[in-house]
Amino acid sequence: MKLYFVRHGRTEWNQEGRFQGSSGDSPLLPTAVEELDTLGKHLAQTQFDKIYSSDLPRAVRSAEIIQEESQFPTEIVSVPELREWQLGKLEGAKISTIEAIYPHQMTAFRHNLSQFNHTFFDAESVYHTTHRTISFIKNLKDKNYEQVLIVGHGANLTASIRTMLGYDTPLLRKNGGLTNASITILETEDFENFELITWNNTDYLLEKAEN
């Protein structure tokens, strides 16, 4: 099975530099809608057996925009297992403010998750956020699907995908986080071993610019 992961489009809170997490949400920016429309055109000839999205509005809307351009319309199923990392007290806060108060924790969150202490913020642990998402993905093993599109969130998908690729916790953020409206593709035959086909790809935007 080939798994296409897309991070939702850029939102107002992304632009303002705020943590969104699993409780916070904000509308997609007009530029994000344009990017997702371009992504939809890029994927228009890809036949997905199913589209799964987080049930948070920014992810659902992103999935809908992509789907609108598809030559092979299919059902969008929104599920809580794909929600963003639950960040507790951080949700809605300005990232710059938290960086000033908890510099070491913010460095850990961005670069070495083994040093991130979720209890400081009443947030989900690394294990919990990745386990709920990976468990959902591995349950797709029993489906007779060839290609699936999964629309989710930056922090959760970055950690979950890297975990599926076999990286230990200190290395989950080594290559940085996923960009808004980026594509990451994994392929698997047994849902235990995953091969990375492409990571955090936004080349489709360059193709649009060239055209």
Question: What residues fall within each predicted segment?
Answer:
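Phosphate-handling substructures
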Residues: 69-132, 195-198, 210-211
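Acidic, low-complexity terminal tails and accessory targeting/binding regions
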Residues: 68, 72, 87-100, 146, ...
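Glycine-rich phosphate-binding loop signature in dinucleotide/nucleotide-binding domains
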Residues: 45-47, 140-146
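Active-site-proximal alpha-helix that buttresses catalytic centers in soluble enzyme cores
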Residues: 12-74
